[in-house]
Amino acid sequence: MPSRTARYARYSPRQRRRRMLADRSVRFPNDVLFLDHIRQGDLEQVGRFIRTRKVSLATIHPSGLAALHEAVLSGNLECVKLLVKYGADIHQRDEAGWTPLHIACSDGYPDIARYLISLGADRDATNDDGDLPSDLIDPDYKELVELFKGTTMD
């Protein structure tokens, strides 16, 4: 096999350098890029990935989370709404049995929790450790405490 330099010998030095750099560029899988767009809150790119069917919303990624879980974890309500609009399952569990509502409660996102509940998220779903979403609420998260008032909290 010819060396890299020999392969690009017919090009000018500038073109050769450009082509050699292009060969070295890193390409990430679509799901990695998709999750990065979710974490950054880039709604335009998230929507584009879904519309072009480059990703599945049901996939549990190597992080152990699905796309909706990642959006909740980032605290971006608009991204959560977009994923739900395109069919993300609000009842989907991650590798530890957490639903998006568990994450919203644990991380202190009352607007997201309220939105998920308005769509019918199960307040009584338990994760693999037997915790309800309300069990994970820090008492300092007053809005969440109020939202779940009347349900058992430790």
UniProtKB/Swiss-Prot annotation:
It comes from the Eukaryota. Gene3D superfamilies: Ankyrin repeat-containing domain. GO terms for molecular function: phosphatase binding; protein phosphatase inhibitor activity. Transmembrane segments: none annotated. Pfam families: Ank_2 (PF12796). ANK repeats lie at residues 63-92, 96-125. Keywords: ANK repeat, Protein phosphatase inhibitor, Repeat. Interacts with DYSF and PPP1CA. Inhibits phosphatase activity of protein phosphatase 1 (PP1) complexes. This is Protein phosphatase 1 regulatory subunit 27. It comes from Homo sapiens.
